[in-house]
A protein has these predicted regions:
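Alpha-helix initiation/capping motif
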Residues: 1-2, 20, 140-143, 160
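N-terminal leader/linker segments that precede catalytic domains of diphosphate-processing enzymes
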Residues: 1-76, 83-100, 104-112, 118-128, ...
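Non-catalytic surface loops within mature trypsin-like serine protease
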Residues: 55, 134-136, 155-157
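Short, glycine/charged-enriched secondary-structure capping and boundary segments
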Residues: 77-78, 125-127, 145, 166
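Short helix-to-loop capping/linker segments positioned immediately adjacent to catalytic or ligand/cofactor-binding
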Residues: 115-119, 137-142
């Protein structure tokens, strides 16, 4: 898989209509009957970055595992990213957070485009997912306060149907606990679900090797 060919294919995929909600629902069918009232909820704005880079003659991207803490996304697998700060664009947020969390030099990051926004009800965030690339393999440096570990994923693994699995998950909410059968992506033996999985599924659909 030639790196430049993949990057070109990603650029070309952004010239077509995004798969959007249809791709999201494949990995989050429980969202189908949920109507999100953004005006009423006034969500916080966040950005993430799916960052492609060359490694060992292959194409990789990285995910991170959040540390354990008293919060909604404790121990979850996600992209580098975070809350939009006053005075910066959502694209700048994605680049800044990637630098702060995994140490990638902002100057080296090339943004290709933005995928479909994803609303996350438990934390009331509206996520703007960006795709970007590096010319060279990065030397990561994780911020231990925000990143438990960095997970490097070969892009070829993303396009195997065998990675789509499901498991029962129990959720704790103010209205009470409930259990759902939740689809997830099995990447590097990690359970990748929720907003991260729906963003990745849209990316899968955009490329479809």
């Amino acid at each position: 898989m030639i790196y430049r060919d993949i990057i070109l294919k990603v650029f070309q995929s952004f010239q077509n209509p995004l798969p959007g909600e249809k791709a999201h629902l494949e990995l989050a069918p429980y969202r189908k009957n949920v109507k999100f009232n953004f005006e009423q909820n006034k969500p916080k704005i966040a950005s993430t970055l799916l960052l492609l880079y060359p490694k060992e003659n292959n194409v990789y991207f990285c995910l991170i595992e959040r540390p354990e803490y008293q919060g909604t996304h404790s121990n979850q697998i996600s992209f580098p990213g975070g809350k939009n700060e006053e005075g910066e664009t959502i694209k700048q947020t994605a680049i800044r957070e990637t630098y702060e969390e995994i140490g990638v030099d902002p100057i080296s990051i090339n943004i290709i485009g933005e995928m479909t926004q994803v609303y996350v009800p438990p934390s009331n965030y509206l996520i703007h997912p960006f795709v970007g690339y590096l010319d060279l393999e990065p030397s990561f440096k994780a911020d231990k306060r925000e990143v438990k570990k960095i997970i490097e994923v070969n892009i070829e693994d993303l396009f195997s149907d065998e990675i789509i699995k499901s498991k029962k998950m129990t959720f704790n909410r103010k209205a009470g606990d409930f259990t759902l059968e939740v689809p997830y992506l099995d990447l590097n033996n990690e359970v990748v679900w929720g907003a991260t999985s729906v963003i990745l599924n849209e990316f899968r659909k955009m490329l479809q090797f």
